[in-house]
UniProtKB/Swiss-Prot annotation:
Domain F-BAR: start-end pairs: 10-280
Function description: Binds to membranes via its F-BAR domain and mediates membrane tubulation. Plays a role in the reorganization of the microtubule cytoskeleton via its interaction with MAPT; this decreases microtubule stability and inhibits MAPT-induced microtubule polymerization. Plays a role in cellular transport processes by recruiting DNM1, DNM2 and DNM3 to membranes. Plays a role in the reorganization of the actin cytoskeleton and in neuron morphogenesis via its interaction with COBL and WASL, and by recruiting COBL to the cell cortex.
Keywords: Cell membrane, Cell projection, Coiled coil, Cytoplasm, Cytoplasmic vesicle, Endocytosis, Lipid-binding, Membrane, Phosphoprotein, SH3 domain, Synapse, Synaptosome
Family under the similarity heading: Belongs to the PACSIN family.
The protein's name: Protein kinase C and casein kinase substrate in neurons protein 1
Record InterPro entries: AH/BAR_dom_sf (IPR027267), F_BAR (IPR031160), FCH_dom (IPR001060), PACSIN1/PACSIN2_SH3 (IPR035743), PACSIN1_F-BAR (IPR037454), SH3-like_dom_sf (IPR036028), SH3_domain (IPR001452)
Tagged with keyword Cell membrane: yes
GO cellular component: axon terminus; COPI-coated vesicle; cytoplasm; cytoplasmic vesicle membrane; cytosol; myelin sheath; photoreceptor ribbon synapse; presynaptic endocytic zone
Classification via PROSITE patterns: F_BAR, SH3
Basic and acidic residues biased stretches: 311-321
SUPFAM superfamilies: BAR/IMD domain-like, SH3-domain
């Protein structure tokens, strides 16, 4: 027997050189266009994150700057603390710049390169993809035709081998069977001879076609290599370009290498190191401690021309440097805060008590009883006047009430010189509110 045929012996490889396996290289061109879109989406999402973070920093700085300015901290440490808010504002601006660079530079750069590198066709797809497809198909067409002939020749040869083996088996078995006549035996022998001739013919043809394929293979490889290198050059441009873009993105994101960013933290450190505890203590001693001036009691001659009163006189609001006295609670509010509200917040850094000394508890604003007609401003009055809100009001301080137009509340005192009244909500909350925001019911 000249050979054997076994269909299971056929191997299907995944090599680039197999017919049609160039399609992965062609698909890479389409993938490159999609990857440009993916990178632009990636940059857009990061830009949104930068924008949101910048806004959060701004909101945080605004809120805490107000709290610090209205809080009890004072002096150089207050300035150091406030420097953190300045840092947040500046870093917010830098992250806004990052967002702008990502969108206006990096994303636009990718978009423009993609537009120049890929050209859409009217019928769909890209010109570059079609050119690669046509190039590979043209280079592979002659070799693919030879491979088709080779497969047919191989199949014919293997089939002839199979028939030869079957004929030989029948001829050998007939020798042991008594029922087979000499004439039948001769036919079986002739069949074996004919199959051997077929095997010889198909083998010669198979070998000839295989030789022809071998001759055309170098030209086939050269043509395929040429088209593949063109695709490689196109892909190389994409890879190099996207690497440059990623480096640009890194440069924009890496604020650690930004001179402005480093300057922000140098300034912050200087502001913090500028805080001086001893200076702050001296300031507090001179403005709120034993270092304050005092009109000590002195003997005063009776003057008949002056009105004589036996009741305790109220001390008129005394103008202090950078502060005004509020008659609502007897506290001094810094002029920097006077623009926010013309009364006293739950805590004002310049708070002083301007009451003259008396052994009568009526002069104590924190006393629990009344004397000489003086009421405790912090006591929950049992009586009051019901009023209705004309407008919405959101309290700006902890000691202010918040209400909506139409809400009813209880007015507990008369309007002070700066237009504020004390009142109580139905929930029991006590606080101040603008007098002209309500009307009597």
């Amino acid at each position: 027997m000249s050979g054997s045929y076994d269909e299971a012996s056929e191997e299907i490889t995944d090599s680039f050189w197999e017919v049609g396996n160039y399609k992965r290289t062609v698909k890479r061109i389409d993938d490159g266009h999609r990857l440009c879109n993916d990178l632009m989406s990636c940059v857009q999402e990061r830009a949104k994150i930068e924008k949101a973070y910048a806004q959060q920093l701004t909101d945080w700085a605004k809120r805490w700057r107000q709290l610090i300015e209205k809080g009890p901290q004072y002096g150089s440490l207050e300035r150091a603390w406030g420097a953190m808010m300045t840092e947040a504002d500046k870093v917010s601006e830098l992250h806004q710049e990052v967002k702008n660079s990502l969108l206006n530079e990096d994303l636009e750069k990718v978009k423009n390169w993609q537009k120049d590198a890929y050209h859409k066709q009217i019928m769909g797809g890209f010109k570059e993809t079609k050119e690669a497809e046509d190039g590979f198909r043209k280079a592979q067409k002659p070799w693919a035709k030879k491979m088709k002939e080779l497969e047919a020749a191989k199949k014919a040869y293997h089939l002839a081998c199979k028939e030869e083996r079957l004929a030989m088996t029948r001829e050998m078995n007939s020798k042991t069977e008594q029922s087979v006549t000499p004439e039948q035996q001769k036919k079986l022998v002739d069949k074996v001879d004919k199959c051997r001739q077929d095997v010889q013919k198909t083998q010669e043809k198979y070998e000839k076609v295989l030789e022809d394929v071998g001759k055309t293979t170098p030209q086939y490889m050269e043509g395929m290599e040429q088209v593949f290198e063109q695709c490689q050059q196109f892909e190389e441009k994409r890879l190099v370009f996207l690497k440059e873009v990623l480096l640009d993105i890194k440069r924009h994101l890496n604020l650690a290498e930004n001179s402005s960013y480093m300057h922000v933290y140098r300034e912050l450190e200087q502001a913090i190191r500028g805080a001086d505890a001893q200076e702050d203590l001296r300031w507090f001693r001179s403005t709120s401690g034993p270092g304050m001036p005092m009109n000590w009691p002195q003997f005063e001659e009776w003057n008949p021309d002056l009105p004589h009163t036996t009741a305790k006189k109220e001390k008129q609001p005394k103008k202090a440097e950078g502060a005004t006295l509020s008659n609502a609670t007897g506290a001094v509010e810094s002029t920097s805060q006077a623009g926010d509200r013309g009364s006293v917040s739950s805590y004002d850094r310049g708070q002083t008590y301007a009451t003259e000394w008396s052994d009568d508890e009526s002069g104590n604003p924190f006393g629990g009883n009344e004397a000489n007609g003086g009421a405790n401003p912090f006591e929950d009055d049992a009586k009051g006047v019901r009023v209705r809100a004309l407008y919405d009001y959101d309290g700006q301080e902890q000691d202010e009430l918040s209400f909506k137009a139409g809400d009813e509340l209880t007015k507990l005192g008369e309007e002070d010189e700066q237009g504020w009244c004390r009142g109580r909500l139905d929930s029991g909350q006590l606080g101040l509110y603008p007098a002209n925001y309500v009307e009597a019911i």
